[in-house]
Amino acid sequence: MIGEYEYLESIGVSRAQALQVMSRASAVFEQEVVRRGEDPREASFGAAEMERVVRFLTEKGVDTKRVGFLVIKHPAVLAYDVEGRLRPLFAYMESTFERDARMFVEDVMKRPSLLGLRADENARRMVEYLLENGSSKEEAVEYLLRTL
């Protein structure tokens, strides 16, 4: 099995940046585990967990070479649960804004922190507020891209 740092290098994260990325992602992974009500001592975070996220992003249209850029800009993404967080976020953004996955990927490339949104929590509340107060869907997207 490939190690964490080697895996990060394989997706375009330099060895010099890998320590910082791994440190941030590990901290977020523990927070995510606790948030789900699980014991962080029983959870492990390594290359296999990262690979699930990377596979999802590439399936959604992020070029493999650009995944490293996303990870450097927003290391926490490596710790997000694909089924519980990323897939629902993509589905929500695609359906709400009538944008396909590739369009959302372009938004994410401009603002990687969009991946930190939770579809069922902060994303929905922000978007509903903006739309209820007269913003168009395009204005709501632009707001998210400028402020997150």
Language-model segments: residues:
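Long amphipathic alpha-helical repeat/alpha-solenoid cores
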Residues: M1-L148
